[in-house]
Each structure stands twice: as C-alpha cells, then as structure tokens.
A protein has these predicted regions:
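Cytosolic covalent-transfer regions centered on His/Cys nucleophiles
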Residues: 1-181
Length: 181
C-alpha cells in the first residue's frame, strides 16, 4: 500500500461493482495492474459468490488476476457506505487485495493479518479518523508488517521437545507420541 493506493472520503458510487472498479483503477494507475476490468471482474465475481463484508463496517474484496503484476493492497474510506453483505450493515472502509494469478499465498497472509487487526476497535477508529493518506499507509503497514514476537518463543521452545520426541523412534511407532499430539 502506498498513498497512491488510498482514497479518503471517496465517492465511489453506491454499488459493490463501482467501489471495486474504482479501487482497481487505483491499482492500475500505479502500474500494478495491466487492465482495470481484468482486475475488477475477478474481484466482483468473487464478491458475488460470497460477500466480503466483515464486522465494523469493513469489506475486504480480494482476488487473483492475470492483470495484476505484483501483490497489492488498496484502501478506500467511503463517504457513504456500500452493501458488501456485512453482518452489521454497509461498509465504509474497503480494502482491495489484488494478487497475480500465478502468485503464491502472500495475499492470504495479508488478508489474515488485516482481518485480525480489523477486530480491534482502536484500529478501526484510527482508520476512520486518520487525516491523511500517509497516516492510513502507516497504520496499515504497521499491521501488515507486524511480527508476532509472543508466538516465536513458544515455537522455538516447542521445537527441541518435538525433536526430542522424534529421536525416540520406537516410542513414536508404539503410538506413545500420539498422546502428546
């Protein structure tokens, strides 16, 4: 996400299709997609199968597309909400995650990190009240690039135990290790 991929208090129309198309235009205009329709249509099609509205007045349409040249995150804070089939009404905060068709699963990691942050009321309020595009970019990058330091020590401390269990191969074949699983 860059400031060129952020729209604040935007009027992107009153339909899901128009919001997605306007966000796809931002992606195209930054050189990260070769064709607006080639990006917008897969996201619109995916949205038609299952709405991407989440609690808090947020939507996260996402897709893979041949038109996308690099994984991209675009954001719009809408002047008026649009119905993305969210559980609590219209969405005013919309993130478009666009990934190349042949790309890996990086966009799913972004989606996961973003979704975790969007349940925090302080994060939602910061997005709603941010005065500048630069502030939006900072807020989003802080979340998307955040590491989870609390989980790493647990994983590292579990690794030696797993390795120790693995050295007793006869115990593993007896099924005694299944109790630890």
């Amino acid at each position: 996400i860059t400031t060129e991929l952020v729209a604040l208090d935007a009027d992107f129309g009153d339909s899901v299709d128009s919001v997605i198309t306007n966000l796809a235009t931002l992606v195209h205009d930054t050189g990260r997609a070769t064709d607006v329709a080639g990006l917008a249509q897969p996201a619109i099609d995916r949205e038609a199968k299952a709405g991407t509205g989440v609690p808090g007045g947020v939507a996260i349409p996402h897709c893979r597309s041949e038109a996308v040249t690099e994984p991209t995150l675009a954001f719009a804070r809408l002047g008026r909400g649009v119905d993305f089939s969210g559980p609590d009404g219209d969405a005013q905060l919309v993130f478009l995650i666009a990934a190349p068709a042949g790309g890996g699963k990086a966009h799913l990691k972004i989606l996961s990190k973003l979704a975790r942050a969007l349940v925090r009321k302080d994060f939602l309020e910061a997005l709603r009240s941010a005065p500048t595009k630069e502030e939006i970019v900072r807020l989003v990058l802080d979340v998307v690039n955040a590491e989870k330091p609390k989980k790493k020590p647990a994983t590292e401390s579990a690794a030696p135990a797993a390795g120790a269990a693995g050295t007793g191969s006869s115990a593993a074949s007896n099924g005694s290790s299944s109790a630890a699983t």
